[in-house]
């Protein structure tokens, strides 16, 4: 037990490992009693290894399922879906799920079936480590069934193995060949394969709330016909061709729907009914809000049939109905089914607002489509009503966005990547606290980083740009590593807990050593290695980032300051203050902060490259303020609006992208007294998204993810605008002294009850739960934190 506890994050060590009197329930939480990791012999390291395992057991009072796996599992009890998991963990670890089976058991014999996937490929979503399943059904006094003793299994041949990936960032797409009903498959004993011990991992508690599996019905909204337009064009996206991802060669694909579907043309028909569809016909389904989860189809096949399911976060442009490659994905699920009843949900979670079902051959009737949701139920805790319905609607869209991106770790999107990106997490973590009253998902995210071993393809001291992940090359973003330490400080202040910071001491020391290598004679970072990334705009062009990149140095100064405060290092605080002055001296040309300087004859020379985003980095980092650079601040506030015509205003100055430039702009405007300007801009920016998909987007347009975690930060901006709430400092509630702009009622959750704010007419007041107290601040802040 002590050996196990030595490997656990400090959060759990402080809660359990330091106690000498752990009760039996605590011990059981950290380990399996008898289960061992297993897999089907010879398949634990193969690409896209999908297996079925099963065990029969007698019903018993208090029975629970304890389970983990790598990469993922889906559990069924007596044919009924139980759960998908586990929550992701660092290399060498696995998070353990525990479920009560009390309400699901039937008298006598019960059958547990587990569908498990070991992807064994490189991705931003899961680890490239050997597959295993570890599970047991138990009561307080007995183990009723466990892997290594009672489970049988087989390769899940119904799922086609050699297929295209879903995306560059995620593993393999889904194609199935069912010779009998899936309901029969998931309610039958799995046998025929040799189940053997496998390489496992150190178990950890799940740490986060179990997801909500609410079913969302998609309504039939159209139908039509399709036909082959011409010979299929080769579908050769990078995730189809780059061998370093660990993929199957195209020549070995057993099916390739992305290619043959690309040759189809569509003809809309009349009516919406999906009661009967023949070969060459399609039905279209939609939902009012973009949903994240498992796509489920139910129908009756009048004969053996082939069906393709295309899905996307928005309706396609005519003549296509669903652009299944729009978001850099192969968003297709393919089925070959036998005559009879059929019902199946995708193994993996995806996102969809529009779903198109194509009958490739055969005939089906009574088609129904739904999504089994996969989201964080705690996001419902924030309550807000407001006389401005636009603000209400944006907050509701932010709620959906946060819930879908805070399931096991903080993710960028629940579609293309499901990856735990730094920088994004800084913003979504603040939103998690606002919506849920806690930061359980961020804690798990930061624990994974703290537990991550040194990765072979990264320089010494560097942390991965997203995690848990196994990259296909040595790509890393030094700027995102800076955001890691900035977030650690923000998390510590926000939660009042030092667990994450204490667990990350070595990571912080490693990063400080890493960046010190690039400091020049002025203390400025010069010729940073890796992918110097600021945002997707001209600010990130090679001409702007080479040499001494000033936005990177502005962020470095903030990183040093936050790290100094976090660990009580006065020398880092002094270094940060000095660096801010140095950056301003070298970057500011009298009107604007320039983006970079390069060496010419041994001297640093500014090159006249100016981005709008650089200006916001300056104010966000504390290099600039309205007091020190008042003229620039006024110009940015009044003239450099999102609607700026760059050919007339600020000629030659690159416009920002949504993330991160526009977000930094909104923060700067809010904190430095331009609340009404900020409100006008964020309503204009986010409201159209909320109306169209009920979620908030990666970009200002529809070219990327339409459900992106960091965008939930819109709710933080709105709540601050309405009542002055700026977040928590432990149990202190930070409140700016403002005049509320309209009538509203807000309940901000905490573990002890909500912080309430009411504004009616000229009267407004706060009410605080026991243990929480206000910390009032000036409406115009001293720094943009």
At which residue positions do the language-model features occur?
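Generic recognition of long tandem-repeat/solenoid scaffolds
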Residues: 274-275, 283-286, 343-345, 593, ...
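Beta-strand elements of well-folded, non-transmembrane domains
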Residues: 69, 118-120, 752, 761, ...
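Short, surface-exposed charged micro-motifs
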Residues: 64, 296, 756-758, 765
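Active-site core of glycosidic bond-cleaving carbohydrate-active enzymes
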Residues: 420-746, 752-756, 763-777
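Extracellular/oxidizing-compartment recognition motifs
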Residues: 11, 17, 22-415, 424, ...
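Short "repeat-start/strand-capping" segments in structured domains, especially the N-termini
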Residues: 351, 761-762
